[in-house]
């Protein structure tokens, strides 16, 4: 059956200073959410894909009509709240939640994260990236914390046992990944430019 992928695509994207919905910002000539969809579709460990949208992302919801994915409308409050809402509404079991703004993500990275979750034996896993890696790519990072002497920030990728979503505290594995595919998410115009540069560089290899 595999893991259910839940793409979080209902946020306001206020830091972008753009009228375009964040999942529809283009990298490599395609909306960024399409890169995430492709990675999930090709991942061996993903059995189905659900996309969480909101009133803030109506164009994204319309784009998704051409894809074989389920769509759930969430309140559009914030990532964790909307993730919980989607999991409860659809009664999901093992879920990989991922932001819609990771244009470099690929199926190999997705499978690696799921495999790490399955090995760790904990009900939840959060992927983080070191600020050092972010800085090397010219990226910023908010909401960080210290882990084993490193300053890390959430990557916007989580795996959780949806059957335990209502528990206040879950034992959580912290998975540090310093791959650019995980580090590169888009919150500002500058980060969109960096994403395009990295995407074109990868094409030339």
Identify the meaning behind each predicted range:
Residues 1-18:
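N-terminal nucleotide-binding beta1-loop-alpha1 segment
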Residues 9, 53, 99, 128-129:
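Short beta-strand/turn micro-motifs composed of small residues
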Residues 11, 101, 188:
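Active-site glycine-centered loops adjacent to acidic/histidine catalytic or metal-binding residues
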Residues 22-36:
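Short catalytic helix/loop segments, enriched in acidic residues and glycine
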Residues 32-94, 107-108, 147, 152:
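Conserved N-terminal catalytic core of the sugar/cofactor nucleotidyltransferase
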Residues 93-101:
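Short beta-strand-to-loop acidic/aromatic patch adjacent to the donor-nucleotide binding site
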Residues 105-187, 197:
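Conserved core of the sugar-phosphate nucleotidyltransferase
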Residues 189-205:
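Hydrophobic helical membrane-anchoring modules
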């Amino acid at each position: 059956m595999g893991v259910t992928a839940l793409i979080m695509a209902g946020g306001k994207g206020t830091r972008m200073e753009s009228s375009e919905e964040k999942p529809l910002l283009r990298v490599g000539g395609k909306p960024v959410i399409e890169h995430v969809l492709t990675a999930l579709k090709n991942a061996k460990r993903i059995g189905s894909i659900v996309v969480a949208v909101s009133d803030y992302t109506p164009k994204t919801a319309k784009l998704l009509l051409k894809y074989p994915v389920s769509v759930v409308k969430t309140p559009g409050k914030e990532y964790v709240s909307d993730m919980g809402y989607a999991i409860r509404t659809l009664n999901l079991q093992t879920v990989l939640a991922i932001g819609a703004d990771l244009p470099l993500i690929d199926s190999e990275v997705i499978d690696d994260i799921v495999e790490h979750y399955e090995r760790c034996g904990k009900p939840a896993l959060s992927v983080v990236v070191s600020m050092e890696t972010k800085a090397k790519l010219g990226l910023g990072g908010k909401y960080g914390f210290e882990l084993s002497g490193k300053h890390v920030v959430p990557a916007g990728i989580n795996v959780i046992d949806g059957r335990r979503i209502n528990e206040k505290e879950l034992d959580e594995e912290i998975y540090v990944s310093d791959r650019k595919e995980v580090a590169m998410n888009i919150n500002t115009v500058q980060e969109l430019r960096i994403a395009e540069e990295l995407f074109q560089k990868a094409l030339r290899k």
